[in-house]
Amino acid sequence: MKKIKIGQIGIGHNHASEKMAAFRRLSDFYEVVGVVESDPEWKERRGNLPQYQGLPWLTEEELFQTPGLEAVAVETDGFDLLSTAQRCVDHGMHIHMDKPGGEELEPFRRLLDCFRQKHLCIQLGYMYRNNPAVNFCFKAARSGWLGDIFEVHAVMSRYDGDDYRRWLSGFKGGAMYIFGGHLIDLVISLLGRPQKITPYQRKTRDDNLYDNGFAVMEYPRATASIRTSVVEIDGMKHRRLIVCGTKGTVDICPLEHHSSRYHLDPLHVRLTLKEDNAEFKAGTHDVVMPVMQGRYDLQLTELARIIRGEIANPY
């Protein structure tokens, strides 16, 4: 089948280089035509990464004028994701846009409306949507194995130094703004729109960064807790999703691996059941997931299938 011609705008996002690595691995689906980076500082810092070796560096206009271009990965450093995405939809492009979707809801809503009106795909960089351990959790919940869900606990933290802290302080929401969306996305997939959200923002240092975030999402018969920080030592190993119901619990920890470990280490799910079901007996099980080839491969494969018309956009 014909490959999808795709380019990348921006290399400043922390996910940008590994996204490019995934696009290049997925050569049955994609032909990468080039990279755009208008900020000389980002090009100096990251332009020589191996993920970009051998690719042409283009201006944005040169990228949009590439014959047969169908899609763009928007990987700017976070402050102009929406404006870049808007230029892409104006040029008739499908996009993968890294998160978050801006600090205000209305501009993001208007952007989504543009994609709907033009029947173009916008895929957001919430990679846990295609995580096999998370999808096993969703299956357990939607199949009724867990009964009525009454509690969700989700954690996504890491440790970062001064340079990242200075960059992150440019966003009003701090760590919760950058990381919380991943977790809120999971909770809404499980429980829907909450009745109320109460945030608790804290600073562990006397600087301008909310580096320790906590939020409670309230439902008629359930609560969900969201925790994010950039001060937890080896925090990636402690990323976690726990879903508790009246008939069972799913516990995923770690929620993911470092990018270098995906193809080596399968994720594990701790499943505890009150009753037998068609696949598992009552009791506690260590369920081993299939090995992933990379953090983003499944999601970007899904994007290709959406663009080709093989599946509808599930989001």
Where are these regions (language model features)?
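N-terminal Rossmann-like dinucleotide-binding module
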Residues: 1-50, 304
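Contiguous beta-strand/loop segments that form the cofactor/metal-binding neighborhood of enzyme cores
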Residues: 184-261, 297-311
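Rossmann-fold dehydrogenase core element
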Residues: 110-128, 148-152
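A short helix->loop->beta-strand "cap" motif at the edges of active sites that frequently abuts
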Residues: 55, 91-93, 118-120, 219-222
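C-terminal helical cap and adjacent loop that interface with cofactors, partners, or active-site loops
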Residues: 273-315
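Predominantly a Rossmann-like dinucleotide-binding segment in NAD(P)-dependent oxidoreductases
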Residues: 128-206, 214
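Short, Asp-centered acidic motifs that coordinate Mg2+ and/or phosphate
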Residues: 34, 71, 151
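Beta-loop-alpha module in the N-terminal Rossmann-like domain of NAD(P)-dependent dehydrogenases
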Residues: 52-114
